[in-house]
Design a protein with these regions (language model features):
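Proline- and acidic/polar-enriched loop/turn elements at helix boundaries
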Residues: 12-15, 66, 128, 161
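NAD(P)-dependent Rossmann-like dehydrogenase/reductase catalytic/cofactor-binding core
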Residues: 45, 55, 106-169
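Short secondary-structure capping/turn micro-motifs that flank functional sites
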Residues: 19, 70-71, 132-133
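Rossmann-fold NAD(P)-binding glycine/threonine-rich loop
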Residues: 1-18
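Short, charged, surface-exposed secondary-structure boundary motifs
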Residues: 20-24
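Internal alpha-helical scaffold of NAD(P)-dependent oxidoreductase catalytic cores
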Residues: 4-9, 25-125
Length: 169
């Protein structure tokens, strides 16, 4: 985006919506979370204006001074859950509910936190780890998009999610 749009006009962030396909044409909504946003260079009033438009549409929005912390916060949960659930072809809750998956997720998150903090973020190890497990519990019946990709023999997001951490670290 920054190649064609001035950085002062770019607003970045993430959102959390869970869904699981039930059958062709039918999806079960499994959760709605917060939409996080901010900017590295855009004026704060532009970010606030965008946030207000999303709030008027019914979304819960949080504007962050350090949006990269919020982006890493969600990425850490994805690092813990998505790859592990795809590898084991399980629902999200298995990551927190199985001692071996729990431990593997801990190691993945710890490594990613080290990379995030080296990139200038200020993430609390214990809080981030607990958040990843909490997401696993809160979305325990969700079949992650990566599991769906494995099931349907499609390319997964592993290079985007865990691969991003590897490229930065």
């Amino acid at each position: 985006i920054a190649k064609v749009v001035p950085e002062e006009q770019i607003i970045i962030g993430n959102t959390a919506f869970g869904a699981t396909p039930m059958e062709p044409g039918h999806v079960k909504h499994t959760g709605t979370g917060v939409t996080n946003m901010g900017s590295l260079k855009a004026p704060k009033e532009n970010v606030e204006r965008m946030a207000e438009a999303l709030r008027e549409a019914g979304l819960e929005v949080c504007v962050h001074e350090n949006v990269m912390n919020a982006i890493w916060h969600k990425l850490l949960a994805n690092v813990a859950i998505n790859g592990m659930s795809a590898l084991l072809e399980t629902k999200n809750g298995f990551v927190d509910g199985n001692q071996y998956a729990h431990e593997a997720a801990r190691m993945l998150v710890e490594e990613a936190i080290t990379v995030a903090n080296a990139c200038g973020c200020t993430l609390d190890h214990d809080a981030e780890l607990e958040h990843a497990y909490e997401v696993s519990r809160m979305t325990d019946e969700t079949i992650s998009s990566m599991v769906q990709d494995v099931t349907h023999h499609r390319e997964t997001e592993i290079r985007i999610i865990t691969g991003a951490v590897c490229r930065l670290g």
